[in-house]
Amino acid sequence: MALICISPILIVVTIWLHFANKGAGAFFFQERPGKDGKIFKVIKFKSMTDERDADGNLLPDAQRLTKIGRFVRSTSIDELPQFINVLKGDMSLIGPRPLTPVYLKVFNERQARRHEVRPGITGWAQVHGRNHCKLSKKFEYDVWYVDHCSLIVDIKILWMTVINVLYRKDIGEGAGDMQDIDDLGFTPRILEIERKEREQNAK
């Protein structure tokens, strides 16, 4: 029902982004771990072009972010295609936000509990700081939700999400600077894991 209601918005934004992204497409697909760590492809609206420099390297994000892309991010419209993930059963409306698979390799046992439920479009951490929330606190919020999820909690999260979107509270143009919110020291470990994976794939 929700997907049917938002379908006019999806169609308009898809056409809008198709032209704004200069042929780079309107959708962005990325692998994310879901319930029990099962990998699925999350769908979002693509807010950047694929423009590259003379050497073939992608230009900085700030240069590739379009005006329309900035708008869909600041209004959280870029998240709407994830209702398709909900329809497919990969995600839920409410739950911990899905991160990239590399986090599975750095989580401790307690942090990994966030995967005991399906990831959500919005969640307890999103209505308590979103991109400005420190990682340690974000994961504590996620585990709290796992232990306390209920219809009443979900309704509360939905209501708080609507308020946050309307007042654009804790909503930015993109994810916060990871080094600003990473109080767990995950960033260097993740970068090292990704470097080794690139080297392995290059062989």
Where are the model-predicted features located?
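A hydrophobic, helix-centered structural microdomain
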Residues: 1-50, 157-203
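Generic recognition of short, well-ordered alpha-helical interface segments
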Residues: 7, 40, 63, 78, ...
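Short, hydrophobic secondary-structure boundary micro-motifs
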Residues: 13, 27-28, 57, 94-96, ...
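Positions in alpha-helical segments
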Residues: 14, 28, 66-70, 102, ...
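Short, glycine-rich, amphipathic interfacial segments at transmembrane boundaries or analogous
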Residues: 25-64, 122-140
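A short, structured surface patch at a secondary-structure boundary
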Residues: 61-118, 161, 165
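Soluble extracytoplasmic domains of inner/organellar membrane proteins
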Residues: 127, 132, 147-149, 159-160
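Compositionally biased, charge-rich terminal segments
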Residues: 136-152, 174
